A protein has these predicted regions:
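Catalytic loop of short-chain dehydrogenase/reductase
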Residues: 70-92, 97-105, 117-118, 142, ...
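Active-site loop of short-chain dehydrogenase/reductase
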Residues: 14-16, 61-74, 106-108, 167
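A short, exposed helix-loop element centered on a Lys and neighboring polar residues
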Residues: 54-55, 98
Length: 195
């Protein structure tokens, strides 16, 4: 459990300087078809999971010398057809981040990073070829890489980001400002379907 991890760190004379919350997930489905259990599972994973880890390790940071937290969410603010449950949870994480930046500053800086279309094996397995071919239709006409996300995280948690807190850095090639969800229209929202 998270409390056991926090206790282990303290008991062994350690302290947490940097926390990156990067657990998350969703299952694509039309919102009207979510079961109560399906909804709760995504909220628990994306929002409550982030909160549980943040609270346990944030308490240590507040008692100690402080620290930095980066919450990985997703590109939010434009709607994401087929994953409304995940969008709601991650918007909750963004608001939690803004609130904690006031409560926990100046000892703890906390920000979010919102990746856009990052080409990974999971992305290729999830989206159909039409959506994947449209990924490059952004002001930066290419998909992102895991290294792009890592570079954003390093910036936010390093001294280079020392005057940034309560913000969400979008690493998405500009799609959150200028892109389109047109490719996601239709009954399957552009997700691969299994027969």
């Amino acid at each position: 459990s998270v409390q056991a991890l926090a206790g282990f760190v303290t008991e062994n004379g350690g302290q947490v300087d940097i926390l990156v919350n990067n657990a998350g997930g969703q299952f694509p489905q039309a919102a009207e078809n979510y079961s109560a259990n399906g909804w709760r599972s995504i909220i628990d994973l994306n929002l409550n999971g982030t909160w549980n880890v943040t609270q346990a390790l944030g308490q240590q940071m507040l008692k100690g010398h402080g620290g930095v937290i980066c919450n990985i969410i997703m590109t939010i603010g434009r709607g994401n057809p087929g994953i409304a449950h995940s969008g709601a949870a991650r918007a909750g994480v963004a608001e939690l981040t803004r609130s904690l930046s006031y409560e926990w500053g100046p000892k703890v800086r906390i920000n979010c990073l919102g990746p856009g279309a990052i080409i990974t094996p999971g992305m290729e397995a999830t989206y159909d070829d039409d959506v994947l071919s449209d990924i490059g239709e952004t002001p930066i006409p290419q998909p992102g890489t895991p290294e792009d996300v890592a570079n954003g995280v390093v910036f936010l948690v390093s001294p280079a980001g020392r005057f940034i807190t309560g913000e969400t850095l979008m690493v998405d090639g500009g799609v959150s400002r200028y892109g389109s969800n047109q490719a996601l229209k239709g009954s399957d929202f552009g997700y691969r379907t299994t027969p």
